[in-house]
Amino acid sequence: MSDTLYRSPSMAIRSSTADMGALTSMSVADLGSLTRLEDKIRLLQDDFESERELRNRIERERADLSVQLIALTDRLQDAECATDSQIESNRKREVELSKLRKLLEESQLENEDAMNVLRKKHQDVCLDYTEQIEQLQKKNSKIDRERQRLQHEVIELTATIDQLQKDKHVAEKMAQKFEQQTIELSNKVEDLNKHVNDLAQQRQRLQAENSDLLAEIHDQKVQLDNLQHVKYQLAQQLEESRRRLEDAERERSQMQAQLHQVQLELDSVRVALDEESAARVEAEHKLSLANTEITQWKSKFDAEVALHHEEVEDLRKKMMQKQAEYEEQIEIMLQKVSQLEKAKARLQSEVEVLIVDLEKAQNTIAILERAKEQLEKQVLEMKSRIDELLVELEAAQREARAALAELQKMKQLYEKAVEQKEALARENKKLQDDLHEANEALADANRKLHELDLENARLAGEIRDLQVALKESEAARRDAEARAQRALAELQQVRIEMERRLQEKEEEMEALRKSMQFEIDRLTAALADAEARMKAEIARLRKKYQAEIAELEMTVDNLNRANLEAQKTIKKQSEQIIQLQANLEDTQRQLQQTLDQYALAQRKISALSAELEECKTALDNAIRARKQAEADLEEAHVRISDLTSINSNLTAIKNKLETELSTAQADLDEVTKELHAADERANRALADAARAVQELHEEQEHSMKIDALRKSLEEQVKQLQVQIQEAEAAALLGGKRVIAKLETRIRDLEVALDEETRRHKETQSALRKKDRRIKEVQMQIDEEHKMFVMAQDTADRMLEKLNIQKRQLGEAEAMTMQNLQRVRRYQRELEDAEGRADQAESSLNLIRAKHRGTVAVGKATDVYVVEED
């Protein structure tokens, strides 16, 4: 076996008869080139559509290559069959040659003469064979040059393999780093799960608090309805009290006019009584004079009495009758005078009662005015407080709506990030599937190339066997030159057949070389196209990812700004909470003051009730201790004048009370309207709180979905790690770049996961802040509800005071009505007394006229009147 030495610029490779190693190195070089091509093709699978197109193209090219490889295998099989048939024919020829040797040995003696001719012919044949051998050597030199080129490629492939091994080592380090990062991410995920559980507990607690708040709000609504009903009743009672005051004012004016008339009538009655007393004195004086005259006439006419005894008896009887009549009239007049005195005393007592009642009414009116002023102040303070609370509630509602809008924006951004994450996960999965398919296709191509390498090695071995067989046949021919004269024709035929077969083999080898060169050119062109497409795709993806990175940076900036705005709003809300707490303290102080005022009013009411009892007892004592009629009349005149002034004051006070009641009614209407508005705002605030709670529930459900997605992504990351390990084990050389690409994708996914976790934390913090704000708003609503209840209590107390005032006004009106009835009765009695006085005067005039007539007759007739005891 001869050895040949081939040198290259990088190394020298020794090839011997065992050229299988060189051919296997060629197959390894082809495998390296194909793996390099597959590696470059895998780099083009970043985008889904471009990957699909490239994969289809590669599959079509692979199908073409498989068809060509099948054709080549068929040709190699045909060549193998031809070589087998040639070997069998050679064996047959060897058998025939052995037979021919025998024949030659037998015919050696016969063919000695023809040896020279055959030797010449044999020399010609040897020349032909040498020419053929030279041609075969040229072909072998060409094959050796191609083998050297392939060896150079093998050297380059070994260098690339070393580089890939280095990349693999770096990738293993990165994989370890990624494993550590996955462990850290799993820890973070556990922390997030704990945080989600805490949020769920907070959500349950918030739901319980919300249900309690809804129950309290329902109770407050019921209380508001009751207070509105009570307010309506109080308004009706105020209207009735206003009407009663108007009626009392009218009755008071009528009573004042009647009192004036009674005063005039009392003056006339007093004058009449003076005249009657003067007339009675004169009548008594005249009676005494008449008695003296009678005594004188009695002494004078004693003598005549005896004469005129019968006449005197008649006259005396008449005088006695007249005297009895006069006495009866005097008694009647005295009775009338006593009745008048009694009426005067009764009127005096009633006037005193009226004065006491008027004083009480004045006191109650002053108390009511003070209470009304205090109530007006309280109503104004409560009104201003309610306005402030409404303004604060509206501001809180606006802030809550702004916070909800910000939360909605954050939610939309979070959903977009989740969708991008899902799209990346889907793309990663598709890339993994494509990588698996490409690895399978690469394994198939490697297997087929290995089979082709084996076929090439087998063909090379057959060629070497043929060369050996040719050499052996040449030696056998040289040995059998003397004995091959008879087989020369057959040898010539064998030569021709061998030439034909060698020509066919050469043509087949040339066709194989051309086809291999064509395939190599086509693969290089496809590789160039794939590299161009890969560069274009890489540029496009670079731009795409740069745009996505810019968008992510913009979203991060927006989120930072939103975070700053949220912090500002939190500061503003904290300041508002401080202001609300200060306002709450002020309202509590005002409530305490109102309670103190209410206690003072209660004490005043108790004192007034005690004074009322004392006045009743004093009135009874005053009724029992009546004075004389004249002093009572004079005091009655004085008190009537006082009553007139008091009545005028009462009218002014009544007008003032009416105006104040109208203003209080208007204030109460405004307070009711504001209470209705506050109720509606509270309802709206509760509706906003319910919507915020519902959005909180939705956000928590969304966070649970995100946790599920996170778990699925973790499982996908684990699967990717397993697939990466499998790809590393399967790809050996060309999978490093794919691993690096997948590692970059995993890093991107991890960065996206970190971003999503950060956003999730931010959203959770925003949710916690909104929960705190909702709690604060609920606390404010509770405080406002308490203030509203306090205001309702104060309104109830005011209404109770108004009812008391109305009752007192009704009692005063009843007393004024009673006084008016008494005055009217007194007027009727005075009229009756005046009538009786007129009758008494007329009767006195008649008595005087009769008395004058009787005196004149006595002087004319000298009649003596004897007075008998």
Swiss-Prot record:
InterPro entries: Myosin_tail, XRCC4-like_C. Residues 1-31, 856-869 are annotated as: Nonhelical region. Pfam families: Myosin_tail_1 (PF01576). One of its GO terms (cellular component) is myofibril. SUPFAM superfamilies: Myosin rod fragments. Residues 32-855 form a coiled coil. It comes from the Eukaryota. Keywords: Allergen, Coiled coil, Cytoplasm, Motor protein, Muscle protein, Myosin, Thick filament. It is found in: Cytoplasm, Myofibril. Belongs to the paramyosin family. Paramyosin is a major structural component of many thick filaments isolated from invertebrate muscles. Homodimer. This is Paramyosin. It comes from Anisakis simplex. The gene is PARA.
